[in-house]
Design a protein with these regions (language model features):
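N-terminal alpha-helical transmembrane segments of multi-pass membrane transport
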Residues: 1-68, 78-84, 96, 213, ...
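Transmembrane helix-loop junctions in multi-pass membrane proteins
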Residues: 14, 30-34, 69-74, 83, ...
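Membrane-interface loop-to-helix entry segments
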Residues: 18-39, 153-159, 165-214, 219, ...
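Helix-loop-helix module between adjacent transmembrane segments
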Residues: 22-27, 92-112, 119, 123-153, ...
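Flexible loop linkers connecting adjacent transmembrane helices
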Residues: 32-53, 76-78, 82-86, 98-126, ...
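Alpha-helical membrane segments and immediately flanking helix-loop junctions
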Residues: 49-80, 113-119, 140, 240-287
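Membrane-interface alpha-helices at helix entry/exit sites of multi-pass transporters
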Residues: 49-54, 82-89, 120-124, 129-135, ...
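Membrane-interface helix-loop-helix modules in multi-pass membrane proteins
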Residues: 57-115, 124-125, 279-303
Length: 408
């Protein structure tokens, strides 16, 4: 399949090396900034600037990241790369924390009313507006794929497992709900995320912890398998250790979006424009999304399922209610991701179109979300992976070349 070949080319060793190398360089230059995250957050102060509150900003950014990647993406990583993929998701998150810190520091330094996120630091910091335009183009395409179609496609598939419904009718409803929400701008998006995300995250966390507690005796073997398969220490795992790395990094990035450049666009809406504050909160988001939530998902699956199914794992706790519960969680996480990614796509489209035709983009974006209810999930996932990778290249290049500006 042509899409699969393109995907394998984009996500080859070159991009994985670039992600890890850039994250490692920033980690070294900033003296392991990841471990100072709590102190940076607690010493941040309220700003008098207009914009989203810090809590709304974090909910919007975290909601954008916490979509299907935390549930279906983690299950997919385990199915394709084995337990070893979990280790490489941790590695991607550790270096990803450094990446998002650098992204947000640079964005806060260079952003203005017209330029936001990577478009700002690639244009004003690096002096390369062409690279900023390329990034914006890939971001628009990623928003239409990963940001909308993938999320709704996965939710629609899960919904069909527990209810008989008309996909075309669902598409119409999705179009209306998404369109009406995103038309309200960052304030309405932030309010929706602030209302939905905390309760959904708390419920999902409690259920996963309960599943893990029920099967607690399996944890030592699970952790042993994670490290053994990550490095191919067992003969049976030797053939998949390299693939576990690739899948783990890819699914980790799909979940936390570190290195893609979406985080600084979202944080540019915050009232507090302190580079250090936005960098610290963005690190927390990657930690919570991947180190915490994806690990809980992986542990629950490895403890309670033989076929890498989140619903099957949760059934040991919720019984027949497991499928409706996971479907509801997917629905909330997916919706938060869709409305958050609209903001990224809209700002990128505005950069390309010089602020024109935003209404047209809004309608097209809502339509792409609606199409997710009827399109084949495999092709949508492949396209999303491709645009994720293409979006990362210009952003990572900018981070490497501006790394000394992060230190100042």
């Amino acid at each position: 399949m042509i899409l699969e070949k393109i995907n394998n080319f984009v996500w080859g060793k070159g991009l994985i090396f670039l992600l890890l190398f850039t994250g490692a360089m920033i980690t070294y230059k900033l003296k392991f900034i990841q471990f100072r995250m709590p102190f940076l957050i607690f010493r941040s102060r309220k700003s008098e600037n207009s914009g989203l509150s810090q809590f709304k900003t974090v909910c919007m950014s975290l909601g954008t990241a916490m979509g299907t990647g935390n549930i279906v993406g983690t299950a997919s990583a385990l199915a394709l790369g084995g337990a070893g993929a979990v280790f490489w998701m941790w590695i991607s998150a550790f270096f990803g924390m450094a990446l998002v810190y650098a992204e947000n520091v640079l964005s806060a330094k260079y952003s203005d009313e017209a330029l936001k996120g990577p478009m700002a630091y690639l244009t004003k910091g690096l002096g390369c507006p062409v690279l900023a335009w390329i990034f914006a183009l890939f971001c628009v395409m990623a928003s239409l794929g990963m940001g909308s179609m993938v999320q709704i496609s996965t939710f629609a598939d899960s919904l069909q497992d527990c209810a008989d419904f008309s996909r075309p009718l669902a598409a119409v409803i999705i179009f209306a709900v998404v369109f009406l929400t995103v038309r309200g701008g960052s304030q309405r998006i932030g309010t929706a995320a602030q209302f939905l995300l905390p309760a959904a995250s708390a419920a999902y966390t409690l259920v996963c912890i309960a599943v893990i507690a029920i099967h607690g005796e399996k944890l030592p073997d699970i952790f042993s398998n994670i490290f053994a398969e990550a490095f191919g220490l067992r003969e049976a795992a030797g053939g998949i250790s390299g693939y576990a790395l690739s899948v783990g990094i890819r699914r980790g990035i799909f979940s936390n979006e570190a290195g893609l450049g979406s985080s600084p666009i979202l944080h540019s809406a915050a009232e507090n424009t302190s580079p250090e504050t936005q960098g610290a909160w963005s690190m927390f988001e990657v930690f919570f999304d991947t180190i915490f939530c994806c690990t809980l998902t992986a542990m629950a699956i490895l403890c309670g399922s033989d076929c890498f199914s989140v619903s099957e794992a949760v059934s040991s706790m919720l019984g027949g209610f497991s499928v409706p519960f996971i479907t509801a969680e997917l629905g909330i996480f997916s919706f938060c991701t869709v409305i958050g990614w609209y903001y990224c796509g809209m700002k990128s489209f505005s950069h390309i179109s010089k602020g024109k035709y935003i209404g047209i983009f809004t309608a097209v974006y809502a339509l792409s979300a609606a199409c997710g209810a009827v399109f084949s999930p495999e092709s949508v996932w492949l396209l999303s992976d491709i645009f994720n990778g293409l979006m990362a290249f210009p952003n990572l290049l900018g981070l490497l070349l501006l790394i000394n500006q992060v230190k100042k």
